[in-house]
A protein has these predicted regions:
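FIC/Doc superfamily catalytic core
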Residues: 1-190, 194-273
Length: 273
């Protein structure tokens, strides 16, 4: 079954490239806006793709929507722009790199936390010094004392694997596994999901792959796949979910392009009777 899905994805990818969809003016910019909108929406932002476009291009805020939702989107945009630049130089994934990315996306919404383990600033990408759980009665993440060593280990694994991943599927699945493992370690008090999705896309940028979007309407399935992996200590549910998201992303982009090409232009003039 998995092999069949990846064959479909490769065919869609070839079609996407053949149609020259990403060559359209500002395509990358607006697709990035969509990535950002869906990533923050998974964390509770109420901004739509149109809201985000107006915010980024015109500086216009969405009436009646919380300021923090605008700040989340602005900060994540800066983090993605940094990731795009760093991917051009294939900057290695290190703990310092991950802290920089988290600091960028938590720049205006993070704060200083004083806990039993000490004080840390979540706006500067500092690792948590306290325990965290996934909501009331939810999954408890690893002890904060173990976080630095586990992040070091993850970065070493990713650096080594990036040199060896040769096939289309291997490259994508490396990015998906990076996402899963970082969010499972949960190094920060906030912004773990956004940073994990950014890391996934960063690896895809490094390989010049189409960046995978996780759709806000699939949030529940996304969270369930992560929990299943964490409970059963297997990556398969998440890899299957992400393959589905990639297929969905490519299919929608191709369909939108085809619809736009079929539209017939008609002159529009006001008729005065």
């Amino acid at each position: 079954m998995e092999q069949g899905v990846w064959q479909e994805i490769e065919l869609l990818y070839q079609k996407f490239q053949k149609l020259g969809i990403s060559e359209a003016v500002d395509y990358d910019k607006y697709y990035l806006y969509s990535l950002i909108t869906h990533s923050t929406a998974i964390e509770g932002s109420t901004l739509t793709e149109l809201d985000t476009q107006l915010l980024f291009d015109e500086g216009v805020t969405a009436k009646g929507k919380p300021l923090v939702h605008h700040l989340m989107n602005e900060d994540l945009k800066q983090a993605y722009e940094l990731a795009k630049v760093e991917s051009d130089s294939l900057v290695p994934i290190t703990p310092a790199f991950l802290k920089r990315m988290n600091a960028m996306l938590m720049r205006t919404t993070g704060s200083v936390h004083s806990v039993m383990g000490g004080s840390f600033d979540s706006s500067k990408g500092e690792f948590r010094l306290c325990g965290v759980t996934a909501g009331v009665g939810g999954h408890s993440y690893m002890n904060y004392l173990k976080v630095p060593a586990k992040v070091d280990e993850l970065c070493a694994i990713l650096q080594e694997k990036q040199k060896k991943m040769g096939t289309f599927r291997e490259q994508y699945e490396l990015s998906f596994n990076a996402h899963l493992n970082l969010v499972t370690i949960h190094p920060w008090v906030d912004g773990n999901g956004r940073t994990a999705r950014l890391l996934m896309n960063y690896i895809q940028f490094c390989y010049h792959l189409f960046p995978t979007k996780i759709f806000k309407e699939d949030r529940e399935e996304y969270i369930l796949s992560l929990r299943q992996c964490q409970d059963e200590e297997t990556n398969q549910p998440f890899l299957s979910f992400m393959a589905g998201q990639l297929k969905k992303s490519l299919s929608l982009e191709i369909e939108r392009f085809k619809v736009s090409q079929k539209k017939v232009f008609s002159f529009m003039f006001l008729s005065i009777i």
